[in-house]
């Protein structure tokens, strides 16, 4: 289910979100 998918991918997703957040802050 979704929870298994999230647990498998969450570390990568969190890294991507952090990178997008940094890029957004720099662009602002």
Curated annotation (Swiss-Prot):
Keyword Secreted in annotation: yes
Residues annotated with Alanine amide modification: 28
Keyword field contains Isomerase: no
Tissue and organ expression note: Expressed by the venom gland.
Biological process, per Gene Ontology: defense response to bacterium; defense response to fungus; killing of cells of another organism
Main localization category: secreted
Functional summary from the UniProt entry: The synthetic peptide has antimicrobial activity against the Gram-positive bacteria B.amyloliquefacies S499 (MIC=0.05 mM), L.monocytogenes 2231 and S.aureus ATCC 29213, against the Gram-negative bacteria P.putida BTP1, P.aeruginosa PaO1 and E.coli ATCC 10536, and against the fungi S.cerevisiae, R.mucilaginosa and C.cucumerinum. It is not active against the fungi F.oxysporum and B.cinerea.
Name this protein carries in UniProt: M-poneritoxin-Da4b
Provenance organism: Dinoponera australis (Giant neotropical hunting ant)
């Amino acid at each position: 289910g979704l929870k298994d998918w999230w647990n498998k991918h969450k570390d990568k997703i969190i890294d991507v979100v952090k990178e997008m957040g940094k890029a957004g802050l720099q662009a602002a």
